[in-house]
Amino acid sequence: MASGFGLTACDREPEPPPARVKQVFHLNPYEKDFGYSQAVLIDKTLYISGSVAADQSGRLVSAGDMAGQMRAAYANIRRTLAAHGAGFDEVVKETIFTTNMDAFLKASDVRFEYYDKERLPTASWVQVQRLVDPGFLVQIEVVAEMP
C-alpha cells in the first residue's frame, strides 16, 4: 500500500533566478585609463557615472561657468542615454555634486532644459570640496529605468 507520500511541486528545489546580465558602456576612450565605465546596464536599470563638463578627449569645457558646465554634463548624459535607446524621461534618480552650491542654485533651472517639470526624477544635491579636476564645478550622475 502506498504511503501517500510523493514528490509534489512544493518538494522540489526552487529554480535558480535567471542570471543577471551586466553590460558595460564606454562613452570616451579615456574612461578605461581612469578605471571606470560611463554606464553599466543591469537588466533594465542603467547606472550612469558622474558626468562632468569634459569633451571627448577629457578636457574641461566651460571653465568657470556653472550653467555651461551643467549643459555639457547633461549633453554627455544625453549621449549615454541615447546609446541605450532612452532619454531623460527614463531617468528616475539624479545626484548632483557641486563645489559651489550657491552658483549651482542660481543655475539650477538648466535642469528644466532636460527634464519635464511634471516628471522630475528623485534628486540629491551635494556640495563637495572638490571634484577630480579643480576646474570642474559640477558632476551629475543618474540612474535610468529602460523602457
Regions found by a protein language model. Name each.
Residues 2-75, 79-84, 89, 98-147:
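N-terminal presequence-like segments and the immediate start of the first folded domain
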Residues 93-94:
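Surface-exposed aromatic
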